[in-house]
A protein has these predicted regions:
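N-terminal helical cap/lid subdomain that shapes the substrate entry/recognition surface
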Residues: 2-117
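Catalytic-core regions built around general acid/base machinery
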Residues: 119-129
């Protein structure tokens, strides 16, 4: 008897980045731009000697490593881990606003809900039976 079924969320149950047109319609920057801005602002708030460019570069390095882990190693590092890695590349530990930064990154994925992939709305109730 099947007791549980699991699914990959992005591009299986929902369409990744399908919320971007809704963000644009609301005059919001992309999630990528917003994440970068939030990270750079948090770094500069506590380490004003770090240039915005250097902070953005550290974040990009951490995100590149994340991409490798996700696509090659089939592992999804949590947001907090990715941000800690970016801070470590700057020689920093978690900032006083670290938890709020993590929450902002995570909440961004659900504040404007992504679109369900075709057939998902019909499939999930059928599987629940």
């Amino acid at each position: 008897m099947i007791q549980a079924v699991t699914f990959d969320f992005w591009d299986t149950l929902v369409i990744d980045d399908s919320d971007e047109p809704a963000r644009a319609a609301r005059g919001l920057p992309t999630k990528v731009e917003t994440r970068r801005q939030l990270f750079v602002e948090e770094v500069l708030r506590h380490q004003p000697g770090v240039s915005p460019g250097r902070a953005a570069q550290a974040l990009q390095q951490a995100l590149t490593a994340f991409g490798r882990q996700w696509k090659v190693e089939h592992r999804t590092p949590p947001v907090a881990e990715r941000l800690r890695e970016a801070l470590a590349l700057l020689g920093l530990g978690p900032t006083p606003g670290f938890d709020a930064l993590v929450a902002a990154w995570e909440d961004m994925e659900v504040l404007i809900p992504p679109t369900l992939a075709p057939g998902v709305a019909e499939m999930l109730p059928a599987l629940a039976e």
